[in-house]
Amino acid sequence: MPTGHGAANRVAIVGASSLRGKELKLILEERNFPAGDIVLLDEPVMAGTLTEVGGEPAFIRALDEESFEGARFAFFAGSQQDAEQNWQVAQRSGATVIDLTGALAASGQSTSWIPAFATVLLPRPGAHASKADAPGATPADRQPRSIAYSSPGSGVIVACTIAAALAKLSPLRTVQMLFPPVSERDQAGVDELESQTANLLSFRPIAQSVFDAQVAFNLLAGYGDECKPSLAEVREAIARDTSEYLAGRVAVPALQLVQAPVFYGYAVAAYAEFAAPPPHEQLEAAFASLGVKLAASAEPAPNNVSVAGESEIHIARIEPDPSVASGAWIWGVADNLRLAAVNAVRIAEELVAKPPVQ
């Protein structure tokens, strides 16, 4: 991690022990983010946990009123409750808030931002005609430093990316089936799938404290009644955030979620129907323009394992529908933790490169 940048770029990570928090710290280091200091914060029960930052030993600190003193950025990567209770504390301390939990997006108290779309999407309807709202402008061009930003989750990034790419070909309708991994429920989800898998293979009873259902060796269209948020609520949140981000600039796809029995990797099966079959090259170019990696003709389709550690969405060769001449199918997968963390760090990078107005 670079040093010598001073407190101006001091970074605080709330929820540092979570899967998102760990990935975020890793991405900051890998991308050589100019942070003079990284402070790891979490709930009191995690205080004192030994970890490392930039190859040096570091301890996770308990989150309190003074945690954000001198911080330039405050990333919220833990629970929604932590974000709801502490984002204004961070803001009052002068930090720019970047929320990965979805809490601020749900309450409408933040600006959602996917930097990869900066030069692709037109301004939102109703935007003032100014240099700050020209195509290619970012939220940093028109928001004060004290604004809170939401870095969308992987499901929203995947849904928006596919919708924006397909929009270039003016589809009549689009549908996306999303397959979230259990790591979207943090380490508890990973542990429950691992435990259920081992116990089922040994013919032992299984724990269902996270999903309130058998997720191992199974596909779920819904969780048990005791699981909160429910899968329907997760779907509604993704649909809401996708719709609000696209904001009339791109047709919003129909969305469905199916819980997959996989640890990592967010998969999607998308269908688009056009007035006439678009040239295959144009479809591929539309996705490539958004940084999506397309499998070559001789390469196998991407899967949850093959995309581990990759920062981009990967899609297979786009296939025509066998029954609908103007229909096309897209299969894609992304490393869910990395995709979300890279987006959040890119927001901070944009703000460092182009500081917002004071």
Where are these regions (language model features)?
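N-terminal Rossmann-like NAD(P) cofactor-binding subdomain of oxidoreductases
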Residues: 2-213, 250-252, 303-307, 313-314, ...
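Charged docking surfaces used in two-component/phosphorelay signaling
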Residues: 2, 74, 184-358
